[in-house]
Amino acid sequence: MSLEKLLNREENDSSKRTDFMGRWYLKMSKICERDDREMDYQNWKFLSYQEFELINEWNQQGKELTKDNCERLLVNMDKTHKEWVEYQKFKEQKDAIIAELKESIQIIKQEPSIPSGADANSVVSSDTEQIQDSETTANSKKSPAINGIKTSGKSPTKSPATNGRRRGAGGNRRVKRPSNLSKTVRSRNATDGDENGNENIENGGTTPKRRSRPKKILVSNVSKDVDAEEEDDIHTEKDASGSAADLDKDIVDESINDSENAPRKRPVSSTSLLSRNKSNKPTKSSPLTPDSAREKENVNGVTEGNEDMDHDSVLDADDSAIGSDDNPNDEQEEADDENVDEEAEDENDEAEVEDDIDDLGAPEDDGDDDFAPSYSAISKVKVNKKVNIDSPMPAIQKELRKMAIKSSVAKAMKRKFTNCKVISYSPESQLEIKITLKQLHIRKYKRHLAEEERKRKAEEALIKAEEEAKKRKLAPPPPPPPQQVRRVEHDLPTYGMKITLKEARAIQRHYDQTYITIWKDMARRDSGRISRQLQQIQSIRGQNFRKTSSLCAKEARRWQMRNFRQVKDFQTRARRGIREMSSFWKKNEREEREMKKKAEKEAIEQAKKEEEQRENLRAAKKLNFLLTQTELYSHFIGSKIKTNELEGTMTDDSLTSMSNNKNKVVDLTKTAASKTNVESIDFATEDDEKLRLMAAQNASNALKETQDKARKFDEEDEEDGELNFQNPTSLGEITIDQPKMLACTLKEYQLKGLNWLANLYDQGINGILADEMGLGKTVQSISVLAHLADRYNIWGPFIVVTPASTLHNWVNEISRFVPQFKILPYWGNANDRKTLRKFWDRKHLRYGRDAPFHVMVTSYQMVVSDASYLQKMKWQYMILDEAQAIKSSQSSRWKTLLSFHCRNRLLLTGTPIQNNMQELWALLHFIMPSLFDSHDEFSDWFSKDIESHAESNTELNQEQLRRLHMVLKPFMLRRIKKNVQSELGDKIEIDVLCDLTFRQAKLYQVLKSQVSGGYDAIENAAGNDDVTSDQKLVNLVMEFRKVCNHPDLFERADVMSPFSFVSFGESASLSREGDFVEVNYSAKNLINYNLPRLIYDELVVPNYNNDVDVRAKLLYHTMNIFHPANSFQLCFILSKLTDTSPNKFATLLEQNVINRAIDLQNDGYFNTAKYSIAYDEGEKIFSSNLLINDKLKYLHLLKNSTSGSVLKNLLEIPSSVYENEYFNSISPAYHPAASAPPINIDVLASNNFVQKKQYEMFNPSISSALSSIPSSVQHKLIVEKGIPIEELPVTEMAPKAFNNSFTSYIEMPSMDRFITESAKLKKLDELLVKLKEEDHRVLIYFQMTKMMDLMEEYLTYRQYTHIRLDGSSKLDDRRDLVHDWQTKPDIFIFLLSTRAGGLGINLTAADTVIFYDSDWNPTIDSQAMDRAHRLGQTRQVTVYRLLIRGTIEERMRDRAKQKEHVQQVVMEGKAKENKQKIIEVEKEHSESA
């Protein structure tokens, strides 16, 4: 059994205590962290608020700052400085005192340890006296002026016992604990180590009474005074080998800590502490425990003096009364004592938790008294100092030393609980303890002895039973020692009685029911009460938390308000001073910074200027070096192939003269070939002559590499064993005649081009044939292939790569000009191309006249997709038609074709420059990679100067332009039409400017208002290339272009029709019917009206009750003069005149108007007379009277009798012209919102009404007379059935509508409005009428296929014959469309897409080109218009370009002109005058909305 169990209470389970402490530690750690964060936030908030107020006040005071105020401010600043100096002195004094204390501590530590057998009490007393002396010295050195150190002026009256105790304590001074600490202040009991009590014994003094001090001390808001000795309660952890000196060291350290905090402490008299402690009565929140009661008794013992003896006598009496074993209430008292012990242990646990919380306290704030804990919070803290056998040795020694000091007191108070005295103690040899057990501990000890005795007896019985079982070789189960063995029968207890099975079962059932009833009562009665108690505890706890937090917040606010008022004036002055000083220093720093930046900027600009000068000089030398090497190479090649002579007189004379005046040219054949890297040359130090020599060596090396490459290609072919004449013996000048196998006659300039191409092939150099479109680049390239086959017996393989639209054109041209060539058309799907690849064998095939193919014609798409197959072939010659397709050096086409293995490459393009100089460099690098290897250098040479000249009309460097022409001449041949074709006249270009219509202007304005970036950015995007502009801006440009073309590109006009309030009948499946289906009248109104039978019978149907029949008789019989019964003589006369019998008169009177008209048309004599006139059959009828027939009159009556209205059209020519010109243009001014058939009327249970209604609505004779009979039915009646014409039923008697617009309520969109809503379409409509009259044929180019759809509707409305070609047209369809246009002159208009129909096709049948909208690239439009303006054109070509004034199209046109100017400068060397004619269409103010 542990020492703690014997001295105090039983120890709880260690595992439960560990879990409990861990949970509380985590919970309180979170609370402390939250409190720290909240405290930091409040401090930051208050300091920020103070700083803000301080700056505001300084700003306000700065406005009113005068001379007096400035002097006053300086005085205050001096005063503050002096205070700060005094504070520094005080701090230095404090540090000196602490240093002295530490020196004294070091002296104490250096003393020898306590020897064995020495008196521990004397050592402790001497140490305590030294510490007290040091404290007294430290307190005496401190200045009394320092705040926080106050001595007690008066000493309260004390009892003799108290005075004696204070004298026995050696005059200990009480030191104040720091006020900002939030830890609970704890005090020791009188029995917890009064080290000074031993001093009186040694001095022979009387034994003092047990010293009692309150355990909880209330710390006031002003000052918190505690005894310095209370710091000894701090827990210390020492090693097991520690000695008594370690304990003294702990006490000294605690004293030092108290001395360091001395400026914030003041002593408090013991009387004030006692009186404060008396007021702390136990409450509900802090119940009175045995420890607290004992402390209460100790405190009372200090003031009451001799009352302790009476109290002890009472306790002894109680002990004697309780200690008797015969007391019947012992068990109840033991249970109560156990409850008391458990409560005390719980309180000790709570005290330990609170001690841990104190260790995790929030950061301390000096001078912050407002947040000091209240007494209620402090009173809950319990001191827990438990020492057991397992505790460290220093703690056990300390506890034993305290016990020894207590035992030295002569008379100890009798206690209710266990008392322990240490009789003698030696740390190494002896420990003698006298323990007096009383009350609870005696009973527990007795129970413990009885339990041990029972266990011993049980173990002995078990051992004895096991021994007996071993003897009998049986192992009976050990009997349970504490339980009573009951006799059991039939698995039921008998309770020591003889009972039957039935009785036992009844007793067991009664027991079970009683057991269950007890548990039910407990669950029903106690569970709710426990739950309510738990909820009540939680609610009370929450209320306490809320109250505490509200009080804390209230105290914090009160503290802030108080401090705010005190510092307000100081903040105002400080703010003004800060503002003035900050403004002054900011201004000063800004001026210095500006001066420094200015100086740095000037230095940087000067350095940059010098660097630019050096770089310009270096770049000029580098440019001169590169150009010199290129010019030498170009001059050498040009002298061999004579490009200048072939081009004719198209170049500028000034450039030619400047070229003639050039310095002497170096002969590359005599110059050593060596390559010098440009990056390794230092252009700043090398001289010009050396650079010129290195340039000549590089040019010679490039020439040698080119020739070696061609020679190597030829040698590889020779190694294959093919016998041909591919290697000419010399490189001399060759004059070539037209090849014999060429089935055409070349013109003079085309023959010159053939010579140039042949010379290029002989030199092994690639070239660009850039003749203007329409000069026969195709036939020249075909002629050079024929030349190779005719002269050198080189039959291939040749490859021609062309756009998809010209594939068939190339096949046709090669077949027509060189029939001996076998052509392989390589296009189609994957399976078709796989079959075509069987025509060549890359290993053993020799290309001669009998080869499977000579020329392969394919497209750029096929080259990219089947590059893996085509790259393995060794092509003799590659021709790229429309080479602007590889204008981008980053495209896959360019990279794939560059990797092909071929001897020579020829590029065919009419526009080598479309947008910028980069495209020209891509073509040059493709044919000569060794010379034109850097685009950046090429751009520095030419691009920037020429493009800036075209854009801003700056001065052009003629020397640079001359050098560009010198570089390009050997590789490019270009002729224009006016220099080589005198029979082909210049085309006329006309820009037609139109104004926006009202609807277009509104849409354009709406789009401009919705653009966020501004309309100027849109116009800039329209002026730039589509590949370089922002894609979003390009999309907006397209929207504006749609408005300019036609508003219906956004939204088409809808077909309008009224709401049909009708139900239609549903028919069966029409698949089983014939060509014609009879459909009955099935349209019915959704409204049905039931006419009452009585009304119908009495008012409508004649009978005896009404006079309907009588009135009809009077109207149609009695009062009718034409009735035979009334006037027979008149009827007889009329019958003679009209050839009508009286009976017929009577019949006609009974009929309605429709039946009369039908009978008149069906009259046999009348029809016979009509048809005899119509069909020239003569008079075949007999008449007793003379009848004069007016043939013209009868012809008008017969106009509806012929099928197809042939006779009607012949008879109504004047009226039809009048109607077409005037009446057909009239449209209804009103369109009903709804339409419906008549309301259905029914009479219930009346068959007469149903029959009459059916007869009136569906009379066959009336229906056939009002409608027309189809032609097929008429043919069947006359031819197949043989019915005479005169017996055919009468038809088309219904009156016709005013015009087609009045035939139906359905309103179709007006085509006239469709035309007038677009300014371009309106102008085009007028232009086409003029061109149709003058017998022109027109090509109309579009950028948008949707606009082509609208144009087809317009052409259909105007009945113009037209065909269409766009990107969706197949290759076969394109060939057929071009053939139809060239061979069928009745086709008036050809609609084409600029991208699809502007490349490589011949449309010379047209003499007029109209651009409905222009392309971004002007060369695309040039190629499109040259489809008609080319060889074979015999008529004057006119080009119209439709533009909208003041819109984005004008900006695009200006940019296109700049690009054209770049082409003119590069190709021709000078700007060409603009010969375009501009026609402005004046704005019509009468345009319809």
UniProtKB/Swiss-Prot annotation:
One of its GO terms (molecular function) is histone binding. GO terms for biological process: DNA repair; DNA-templated transcription; regulation of macromolecule metabolic process. Residues 164-177 have a biased composition (Basic residues). Its EC number is 3.6.4.-. It is an enzyme of class 3 (hydrolase). Its main location: nucleus. The keyword Calcium does not apply. Residues 305-319, 327-371 have a biased composition (Acidic residues). It catalyses: ATP + H2O = ADP + phosphate + H(+). Disulfide bonds: none annotated. ATP binds at D771, E772, M773, G774, L775, G776, K777, T778. ATPase component of the INO80 complex which remodels chromatin by shifting nucleosomes and is involved in DNA repair. Component of the INO80 chromatin-remodeling complex. This is Chromatin-remodeling ATPase INO80.
